[in-house]
Amino acid sequence: HELLQQTRHVRDDATSAAQVAVGQHRPLSQREMMSVLSLLQATPSATLQAAIGDDDESLAQRLKNEVLSSATRLGVDPATATLDPMDEDAIDLIGMLFDVMLDERDLKNRSRDMIGRLVVPFVKVALLDRQIFVQKTHPARRLLNALAEACEGNSGDSASDRVLMGKVEEIVDRLVAEFNESLAIFLTLEEEFRDRSEERRVGKECRSRWSP
């Protein structure tokens, strides 16, 4: 919370200065935000992908810049467009969540790329349902944790590890392709992935039990 407060202070100072310089800005509506995020979800920019896991750049700031620049594709005037403070908070929090996950977990390059593809969909979730930040059992959080756990330390050395990584990629592909504004897909994919992970866990226990 302290980090978010510091981010707000810096952001508010920058916003005030910008408004003095160019006049009153108009925050993007939620409909515009969702439309822009859907564009980024379908075709993420190279600069946003490069910012994922980059210690020298804030993922949240890069995402906010991408949202504003992509809003021009909807006919929004870039000279007056800005973000609603609550939307900025949501992006900041999601950015922090992924920054911490990518920094603290042992994720290989392929895993980092797959987890990074979830950033934009999760910003959409945050705009639709703020409970994601306070409800640990939120389906989107459960799915993200399950995917990250499956990827952590997984170099694909064994056949079962490769199969699991393939399933992670399948889940990510489906989420990116199918998620619009219905959160039900997170519950469906989380249950499906949990079943596959349980099969792998039982299989590993059986092999360990019977190995010499």
Kindly label every feature range from the protein language model.
Residues 1-207:
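Extended, low-complexity, amphipathic alpha-helical coiled-coil/linker regions that act as scaffolds
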